Amino acid sequence: MSEAIIAKKAEQVELIAEKMKAAASIVVVDSRGLTVDQDTVLRRSLRESGVEFKVIKNSILTRAAEKAGLDELKDVFVGPSAVAFSNEDVIAPAKVINDFTKTADALEIKGGAIEGAVSSKEEIQALATLPNREGMLSMLLSVLQAPVRNVAYAVKAVAENKEGAA
């Protein structure tokens, strides 16, 4: 192999390793068997969610995972592998891909990493069932507001009882 090719591959490994380090979440899938239309729809959905999706050679992924400190992730790089990277939203790649697997049997989640920790297929699927950040914040807000709301209703009920008795 020529030195130019080796240098180019080393550069690719470095680039992918940096993406792995910076990613909030990584989802590795086997997209073998997807039609062109399905692949296009999947890529569009991921792009709209701010997720980068690439098909990368396993040898490059393995070396990049080692450099990024995700050695355990090497086990999922068997057969054709495509990787979804998200830098902001931890849930987005898992949710989009998991939703897509319901309509496209050919797409299979192999595993991934969540905030630097290697995760199994089951953990990625569990992550996909969670609401996004805004949904979680609204749930938290409603939980925090509930006691205040209950006190307000109690005070109002007491006031109405006193008015009715007078």
Swiss-Prot record:
InterPro entries: Ribosomal_uL10, Ribosomal_uL10-like_sf, Ribosomal_uL10_bac, Ribosomal_uL10_bac_type, Ribosomal_uL10_CS_bac
Top-level taxon: Bacteria
Keywords assigned: Ribonucleoprotein, Ribosomal protein, RNA-binding, rRNA-binding
GO molecular function: large ribosomal subunit rRNA binding; structural constituent of ribosome
One Gene Ontology term from the biological process aspect of the record: translation
GO cellular component, one term: large ribosomal subunit
Pfam families: Ribosomal_L10
Function: Forms part of the ribosomal stalk, playing a central role in the interaction of the ribosome with GTP-bound translation factors.
Recorded family membership: Belongs to the universal ribosomal protein uL10 family.
HAMAP family registered for this protein in UniProt: Ribosomal_uL10
Subunit: Part of the ribosomal stalk of the 50S ribosomal subunit. The N-terminus interacts with L11 and the large rRNA to form the base of the stalk. The C-terminus forms an elongated spine to which L12 dimers bind in a sequential fashion forming a multimeric L10(L12)X complex.
Family annotation (NCBIfam families): PRK00099.1-1
Protein name: Large ribosomal subunit protein uL10
Lineage: Bacteria, Bacillati, Bacillota, Bacilli, Lactobacillales
